[in-house]
Amino acid sequence: VVGSEALAYNVDEGLQIYGGVGFIEEYSIASMYRDERINRIFEGTNEINRLIIGGTVLKKSILEELPIRDLIEMRAVNWLPDLNLLNEEPLKAEARAVEYSRSFTLFCLHESILEYGQDLKNKQWIIEPLSNMVISLSIMDTGYKRYIQIKSGEHKDETRDILKLSIVDQFENCYNNGLDIIKDLFSGEKLADKLSL
């Protein structure tokens, strides 16, 4: 989902740079645009892929193939566990954003299962934003872990700046999708209580 959407975005932006001549076959962007469209047709739509992601997470959670029950209980008490980061850690705020997103995603999954049970798989208006949260969390988490593995001097400063921007973008995406789920699940005082968390 992420790769095909990133490719689609970049090719579309490249086409915009060329303007009307971007569709002329003499320019390489024309074949890129055509190939990208064909890829998306053969791949299937990302909306279906999102339903598959959400359904898989739901199934593995209910069957306890994903050991999240204890994690949900722990995160319900403390959404930001101690990360044991050094004070001079340059990405301390970003690490906290990743963990907050993990807690928020687990919270939304848990509340959705409590509300709908196994019927959640049929609630596409919940499954899609939940899948978006999982995708955003995956991007943030893997990006942060990959950054940690980079040795000093191997473009670490440039990578840090890109990672910061990516985490801000994905955190906002995760948060907004979570709010959509909460607003679908709750109303009135219960909604206000959940939003106060």
Feature map (PLM): residue ranges:
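Alpha-helical interface subdomain recognition
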Residues: 1-197
